[in-house]
Curated annotation (Swiss-Prot):
This is Na(+)-translocating NADH-quinone reductase subunit E. Belongs to the NqrDE/RnfAE family. Its EC number is 7.2.1.1. Coiled coil: none annotated. GO terms for biological process: respiratory electron transport chain; sodium ion transport. The gene is nqrE. HAMAP family: NqrE. GO terms for cellular component: Gram-negative-bacterium-type cell wall; plasma membrane. It is found in: Cell inner membrane. It comes from the Bacteria.
Length: 202
């Protein structure tokens, strides 16, 4: 149990997708102007990563990995070269289902997220989580823990940034730095803050 708690905390704070690996920056910067929208997208990312990382783990372990098709009588077949294509297809299908669900049941959030919801399909934070899972050879339970933790870490980062950006509206920011300039500086300082978690031994 301790191993999974450690993996979760590591994926949220120490190896934060947005502030340690700088993945998913497009939506991270574009949808962080309002806290409500940022939290909505963060929840969507948590849901997508919690589903796609473990599902892609099953796909890799039982179909794509070298020798994975031994259960079907093909022990020598290696389909790992289809990895990227397969991962993207599964992520796209998951996002499409989530998009239809939000459109039907939470239209206000669907409209607020706008074009950025379909962009989760090509959000490199989602793909990064899947590729890290494959590279580190996580089992299914570890993949589920890592997917939830990585998604939660990204959601936490975008919610924090949105809160800061809302406060910055009332600050006297120098004219040349208004907009993305002060946002990049803020993200850099947040990243430095999260680096302090690297000294934790769990």
């Amino acid at each position: 149990m301790g191993h999974y708690v450690s993996l979760f905390i590591t994926s949220v704070f120490i190896e934060n997708m947005a502030l340690a690996y700088f993945l998913g920056m497009c939506t991270f910067l574009a949808v962080s102007k309002k806290v409500s929208t940022a939290i909505g997208l963060g929840v969507a990312v948590i849901v997508v990563m919690s589903i796609t990382v473990p599902l892609n783990n099953l796909l890799f372990q039982f179909i794509l990995k070298n020798g994975a098709l031994a259960w079907a009588g093909f022990p020598d077949i290696d389909l790992s070269f289809l990895g990227l294509l397969s991962y993207i297809a599964l992520i796209a299908a998951t996002v499409q289902i989530l998009e239809m669900f939000l459109d039907k049941f939470v239209p206000s959030l669907y409209n607020a997220l706008g074009v950025f919801l379909p962009l989760i399909t090509v959000n490199c934070a989602i793909m990064g989580g899947v590729l890290f899972m494959v590279e580190r050879d996580y089992n299914f339970t570890e993949s589920l823990t890592y997917g939830v933790g990585a998604g939660f870490g990204w959601a936490l980062a975008i919610a924090l940034l949105a809160g800061i950006r809302e406060k910055l509206k009332y600050s006297d920011v120098p004219a040349p730095l208004r907009g993305l300039g002060i946002t990049f500086i803020t993200v850099g300082l947040m990243s430095l803050g999260f680096m302090s978690f690297g000294g934790m031994s769990i």
